[in-house]
Amino acid sequence: MAIGNWTEISEFILMSFSSLPTEIQSLLFLTFLTIYLVTLKGNSLIILVTLADPMLHSPMYFFLRNLSFLEIGFNLVIVPKMLGTLLAQDTTISFLGCATQMYFFFFFGVAECFLLATMAYDRYVAICSPLHYPVIMNQRTRAKLAAASWFPGFPVATVQTTWLFSFPFCGTNKVNHFFCDSPPVLKLVCADTALFEIYAIVGTILVVMIPCLLILCSYTRIAAAILKIPSAKGKHKAFSTCSSHLLVVSLFYISSSLTYFWPKSNNSPESKKLLSLSYTVVTPMLNPIIYSLRNSEVKNALSRTFHKVLALRNCIP
């Protein structure tokens, strides 16, 4: 329905990787499908193992379980639709579908930032106050910290998504991305978005920088505590408990920061798609691999669980 020069848009078209040849898109489909399945299986396995094995009923693995839930949600929001655009060329997404995808993208993204900060604090308490660790990080405290990590996603996602989709859209309805991210959708708005853009920039900086500063503060104190440990074996053991989390934090923050804080003149739509893939598709797959390969407790728990499953199968006639 036309209103002046504005057109009421009922759906959007995700350009995804349509500029690439069909053969390349087919290859991308197989690649992303494999990554998607590995992500779901890997994170589901982390959840099941940390629940089933009594040795992993500590605060560290409680937060790791939360991270795995989050990564599964991230993948379910982004990847299925992207696979549809590559396989069946189903590039359309409804107005409500686009808003819903953007909402949950913001929700899971913000939650991950704060959850990574909470996990860093957990490591700080474990290394700097080992004797008081069970008391400080009791069941009630860890539940509160987890809730505090998930909660900020709700107001941020609600305000940003509701505000953006209250603007009128005109002209093209083509979103030059593989999902409904804020910057490419904002380009389709035919109204003054200066105030929204200021809010988005300030909000993004706060959401990224506050958890990042908390992580840096935690690891600065952790590093100081590790340096005071007299034995090399003790230092190695303390560092090994943090190395997996540090690697996960680095992957997430470097890729997301390059996407949203890199100068626009140096960041083409295609390069932004690649950067977005790193933290929406690749990082969720790598997290369970990093934690399982670099953590002996998780590896041992996986081995115990595997042997229990084999034993149960052998008992069944």
Curated annotation (Swiss-Prot):
Protein name (record): Olfactory receptor 10A5
GO MF entries: G protein-coupled receptor activity; olfactory receptor activity
Keyword Ribonucleoprotein set for record: no
Superkingdom field: Eukaryota
GO biological process, one term: sensory perception of smell
Signal peptide residues on this chain, from the entry's feature table: none
Disulphide bonds in the chain: C98-C190
Residue stretches spanning the membrane: 27-47, 56-76, 101-121, 141-161, 199-218, 239-259, 273-293
GO cellular component: membrane; plasma membrane
Residue positions with a glycan: N5
Keyword Transmembrane helix among record annotations: yes
Entries under InterPro entries matching the protein: GPCR_Rhodpsn, GPCR_Rhodpsn_7TM, Olfact_rcpt
Pfam (any one): 7tm_4
Side Cytoplasmic, residues: 48-55, 122-140, 219-238, 294-317
Topological domains annotated Extracellular: 1-26, 77-100, 162-198, 260-272
Organism of origin: Homo sapiens
